[in-house]
């Protein structure tokens, strides 16, 4: 589960960078 946390944060970072 802890491995999903950095993945989610990275996804949010990529999503924010996209906009």
UniProtKB/Swiss-Prot annotation:
Location of this chain's protein in the cell: Secreted
GO cellular component, one term: extracellular region
Principal place of residence: secreted
Tissue: Expressed by the skin glands.
Modification sites for Phenylalanine amide: 19
Domain of life assignment: Eukaryota
GO biological process: defense response
Keywords (A to Z) from UniProt: Amidation, Amphibian defense peptide, Antimicrobial, Secreted
Family: Belongs to the frog skin active peptide (FSAP) family. Phylloseptin subfamily.
Record's function text: Has antimicrobial activity.
Protein name according to UniProt: Phylloseptin-Az5
Organism name: Pithecopus azureus
Gene for this chain: psn13
